[in-house]
């Protein structure tokens, strides 16, 4: 199990041709695993949808108009939102195989200047991940929308807050989904044991929740294999029982597939019918998780699983329950379990209890994925991310988030105890996330896909009108439990926005106060700088100039290493960066300075998995850069100028010489002559790998100088390696407003003190660490 990183993986499909059996087998395997992770929330909904729908003033009458209207609403809602919107359309808006609210936002950041997170920089414009889409002519509407957002900074701020709000709602779902599903399942015990006290069902629900969250550290792959048979059994049960109830009680409920009964329902039920939408919306729970969990699987595997198995079984289950209710109007509050034949009651109750754990798994996995994306893009405090699969990179586990979710789930279960109030909260959280996705899709269709604005407007009107209708009914239930997701999301939004603001202010301060190279060298000569043996890695967020914390260190302690490498780790608005494009290496100033800069680029779905090998990788890239610089004569197609620096600094993309993902130890060996250099790597599999740089007997002066510089680099590495990072405290300026002081000094300061230290995140050994303390006034 790797911390802060994983293996490779993209959609999880084997790297073969699409017509091969290997690719088909991989897709079917992912489709099978998806049952245990993605669809559980959707599939457990029949347990409580009708109960919550008829919990208000809506009642059934002899003509069956109400039950047929509710069934018609459920059927068309399932068809429009999960099937048409998400499975067919929204899954197509993936960000190189990743889904979720932040994936849509990263598409906008990469294709325009709408975003505030990691807009494309000059040094990253040639990345293959930025240029995967086929170039197409940009429409006039697309240019107008982009220009409108670029002109108004406030709109970009609102867009980011809107994305963070949608993300916060998904995280809030991670609290409500397990609570709602488990409580609804165990409530079936009271059908057979009416005298059973509520405290016992709550206690049983708490035990199940604790067990569910305790399993998370095993990873999505293991949990998926464990849970998939459970959900497939559950779908088989509810689909088969649905057919049984339709045939036995009322085959004519098939009439409800006509949308006429929706019109007839609202005409007769009026305001009570509108209010019941707060319960009907629960049939859509889990639709957003299908998109958020896309990184764990692939588009085709999700589409196969939903259209062939999940959708038909759900429709049959809802129709069968409606058929039973049409003949048993007195069983409104327990229709699901009352509709079960006596012979299968206990097996179905047992499977339902297990299926609730599966239903909760979908949103828990989505919560992990989204928080990991937020963390990588600087919108969430530094936390530990564990990659649980060496094959699919998106399968992760976050211990801190897991235990916080468990604690909140237990608190809501014990505090609310009733699925009706939790359902009111749940419905509001679900529909707000869907509205956020619809709005972002409008921008994606027009500016990323470059389609006519008419198509984007049609998408927004068709799905947005349905979602706004549901939203209006859910907002009316805010006093009756709907306040809970608002409280959870606002708290999460405060954490995310404050962390992003504080981090952005700190980085802006570092950029504004960086020291130019000429001034730094002049300062160094004026204070009698001493160069000590060894290699120094200076970590900072600046990509040009000298970071202020290093200038501060040299001013107070005028000495640094003979070889100095400024390292900047950047997370870009792409899910993954290929190993061949990860390192961007350049020289600062003249060769005599022995100053280098290395920009290490990651995608927002990637992490650091090479802590113990990172130092050697960097040095190897510098060696390759020196060789490349000499061999290319200072030019080449893969060289990029850091024009913004204003210095003599040219940077080159240094491709990966081989797969180094399994390396965990390097030993540098300077040759006995100045004409060769070997870098040995002991591979994790037991073999040895050598990267050798040789002069081919040319004997030229440039080759000798390059070999001498490489040898000196090796010797300095043997003398010792040190790491320097800034330990900065950010404070609001004394003239700042009270709100800014509270956000920066109190909230951001609290989050910074209680998040993982940068040295831990970077995997820096504490025995070689130098932390430079500075206070920033922003």
Swiss-Prot record:
One of its GO terms (biological process) is potassium ion transport. InterPro entries: K+_transporter, K_trans_C, K_trans_N. It holds the Pfam family K_trans_C. NCBIfam families: kup. Glycans are attached at residue 199. This is Probable potassium transporter 13. The keyword Transmembrane helix applies. Keywords: Glycoprotein, Ion transport, Membrane, Potassium, Potassium transport, Transmembrane, Transmembrane helix, Transport. The chain crosses the membrane at residues 29-49, 73-93, 157-177, 200-220, 223-243, 277-297, 304-324, 344-364, 396-416, 425-445, 452-472, 478-498. The gene is HAK13. It comes from Oryza sativa subsp. japonica. Residues 655-677 have a biased composition (Polar residues). Residues 655-704 are annotated as: Disordered. It is found in: Membrane.
